[in-house]
Amino acid sequence: MPETKKKLPKAYGMRDEQDVLSAVRDNGNGISFVRLVFPDILGRPMEFTIPGSELAAAFKDGKGFDGSSVAGFVRIEESDLVIKPDPKSFRLLPWEYRGFDEGIRWREAVMFGDILKPDGGIYEGDSRAALKRNLLRARKEFGFDDFKCGPELEFFIFPSSREPVPADQGGYFFSGRHGEVRKEVQLLLHRMGIATEYDHHEAAPGQHEIDLRYESALEMADIGMLFRYMVKKVCRMHGLYATFMPKPINGQNGSGMHVHQSLWKGGRNLFFEKNGPYHLSLLARRYMAGVMTHAREISGVLSPWVNSYKRLIEGYEAPVYVAWGQKNRSAYIRVPEYQPGKERATRIELRAADPACNIYLALAVMLAVGSEGIRKKYDLVDPVEENIYHMSGTRQKRFDIRVLPRNLEEAVRVMEKSEVVREALGDHVFHTLIANKRREVEEYGRSVSGEFDKQVSDYEIQRYLPIL
């Protein structure tokens, strides 16, 4: 008789708690453990694992953990927190684990969750909750039902985490030997229900990019966390090291996270208007005006590391000036040109964020300042289609072009005065993040005798390369 092909377990797309429990309880699936994942205030993944048999209890009452051990959470005297898994975030990890005993094999799933206080209230230090709160507010106020985002995350591949030596000497669209690493990452993502659009070698030696297909903001933030994990894991399996550090190599382009975004209602893209300027609706233009008006204030969230500002300098295809255009890749925001029949693709592309940011907080502040532009009916300035790096100061003033913060110290100082950012993040996250970044600036200052410059320092390599 022909061998019966084993049915693969359902890997994603769960509707509710019962759907998840059915998948986990199915003995044929071999799902023995579930990883519960959440971000700390810096956007790094925190996790602990529970047996699949404990998942029903976790859905009912949550699972307690010590929050005092997590950056930006609570003090030791008030450390008890609870994570409640989000069933829609369930994804089966696309491999099987094996023990030393060949008879021991198991599979694991991953789930993101909401952080709660012991009394069941929402914990105000939860980055995921901050994004959900901003989504809910904008939906209630403006009536849209989806904030779609599609990030392009760039990263470097090095032989090890000890020093930033590129694993190849390729350039833009170079077809080098690490293309198969990108393909393997994509195939594993596809098995988890995560869609990609394309991959390619980026401009700098050892630099790569895989573009994710747009999704609703909360799901995309979860996907962003999984993406970074998957890239690092696949590279590790190949004896390589992947980093999302914004600027690991002096004299080369840094890594960005360009975020394509649009608002939707009832399956219709609210950013599109057939007869609007650049085919943008009034809502889209006001949204974009809000993002640009508050660009300096959100810089500390989108580019949250000392090293982030070594990327945001002239001459390396990174935005330094707050302006927008269609073909201008030196601008802060780019509006891709409209293609007839592609109304769904109408969007704006914000180019300033870096791939090591807290994605939840980054999307939260983007939506918040865009909403502020809609709420207060901001006017959009004229587009700039020339290279801003080469424009005179007089010409920059004519287009009302402002400069992004030049370093993290300036970014924190500007953010601290921003009421719209404080409201978007909530008091706890806002003040904790500012305090954390001040300590980072002080530590950097001590290591380089108080000087901020454009060169990547040894301190940054030692501090960021192993962790980002």
Feature map (PLM): residue ranges:
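Glycine-rich, acidic/polar active-site loops that bind/position phosphate-bearing ligands
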Residues: 2-468
